[in-house]
């Protein structure tokens, strides 16, 4: 079944009709870290992305979550596409972060097992794909022109200090499996953190990847 078009084309439009604390909430943990983990479609919009983002951040990285609060609401009702996502707290956090990773959920469809890793930060993207595969998780790099590639310059993941970021699209079946197995969730998050740490070391040293 085709996904319905988003009800709102910006957070500004959403805020005019929806009530914070009833329909949605914004949760942010700003830390002295160059890394921001964001989940702009969290809560009941794309289930489990909030928990996955929290586990990746692990009290170390800055964390942002925009959460839909009503389980009866449909995906399109509170989903603002990443190119149009203009919630001010998210904008500010991302603009002040050197490394940005956005956590999203996608439908299983033709590839129910692979995390799709996109975004314009191709070096970090590739490190995350490799790290997930090493730990036994299926992952593929998404490239410009492919669906859910996160390759638009306006995508919120690409609006950080370096104007590049990573977008992680996790299929529903994988999200459900991670929620059902705390150790597997920790392992998944740890693989991503390890890739971020490796990338951060190279970035601070000025070496080429």
Please report, for each region that a protein language model flagged, where it lies by residue.
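N-terminal catalytic or cofactor-binding beta/alpha core of small enzyme domains
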Residues: 1-209
């Amino acid at each position: 079944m085709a996904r319905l078009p988003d009800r709102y084309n910006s957070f500004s439009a959403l805020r005019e009709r929806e009530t914070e604390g009833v329909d949605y909430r914004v949760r942010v943990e700003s830390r002295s870290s160059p890394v921001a983990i964001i989940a702009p479609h969290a809560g009941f919009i794309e289930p489990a992305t909030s928990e996955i983002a929290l586990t990746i951040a692990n009290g170390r990285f800055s964390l942002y979550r925009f959460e839909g609060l009503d389980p009866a609401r449909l995906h399109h009702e509170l989903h603002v596409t990443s190119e149009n996502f203009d919630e001010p707290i998210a904008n500010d956090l991302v603009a002040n972060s050197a490394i940005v990773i956005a956590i999203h959920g996608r439908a299983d469809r033709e590839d129910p097992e692979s995390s799709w890793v996109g975004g314009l930060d191709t070096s970090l993207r590739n490190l995350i794909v490799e790290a997930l595969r090493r730990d036994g998780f299926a992952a593929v790099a998404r490239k410009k022109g492919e669906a859910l590639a996160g390759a638009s310059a306006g995508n919120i993941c690409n609006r950080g200090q370096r104007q590049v970021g990573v977008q992680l699209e996790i299929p529903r079946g994988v999200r459900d499996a991670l929620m059902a197995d705390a150790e597997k969730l920790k392992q998944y998050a740890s693989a991503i953190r390890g890739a971020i740490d490796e990338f951060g070391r190279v970035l601070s040293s000025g070496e080429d990847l």
